[in-house]
């Protein structure tokens, strides 16, 4: 694990993060238990949870949330306010009425392949794979896999162009 990036942004919570070289992290970020590749840029007000893998030369814009179980390939762009969801059946309590703990969640992994771009305000549901070079339009809700090179947009996201 390398040390905290050298930029001196205020009010960051960073715990147990494996940073590559030349990573820049903006102010007001929460990063814990994740891995961030070389030359990646993380904007302000971003949260990245544990067990997230982020490739090299990615750009993650402000106000984005990347939850546990997400993997971003190299050179991925994540637009402002993008959200990843990692539980297929979210609920506050168990069937017995007890408040859920981390052990109660059914985490489903999500993969965004190399050079894919997600516009601002995209929501990516758990278990989805977004293919290499795919483009997801702003505000889309991705509920199923996106093939490499496809352009999708809308709610739910639908194919608008194929390579």
Where would I find each of the regions flagged by the language model?
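Flexible, glycine/small-residue-enriched loop-and-beta-strand segment within the central core
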Residues: 2-15, 25-127, 155-156, 160-163
């Amino acid at each position: 694990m390398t040390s905290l990036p050298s930029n001196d942004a205020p009010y960051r919570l960073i715990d147990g993060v494996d940073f590559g070289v030349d990573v820049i992290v903006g102010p007001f970020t929460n990063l814990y238990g994740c891995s961030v590749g070389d030359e990646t840029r993380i904007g302000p007000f971003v949260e990245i949870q544990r067990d997230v893998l982020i490739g090299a030369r990615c750009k993650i814009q402000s106000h984005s949330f990347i939850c546990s179980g997400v993997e971003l390939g190299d050179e991925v762009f994540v637009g402002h306010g993008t959200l990843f969801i990692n539980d297929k059946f979210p609920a506050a309590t168990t069937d017995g009425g007890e408040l859920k703990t981390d052990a109660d969640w059914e985490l489903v992994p999500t993969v965004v392949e190399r050079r894919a771009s997600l516009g601002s305000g995209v929501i990516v549901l758990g278990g989805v794979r977004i293919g290499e070079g795919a483009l997801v339009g702003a505000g889309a809700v991705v509920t199923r896999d996106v093939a490499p090179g496809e352009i999708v947009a809308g709610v739910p996201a639908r194919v608008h162009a194929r390579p």
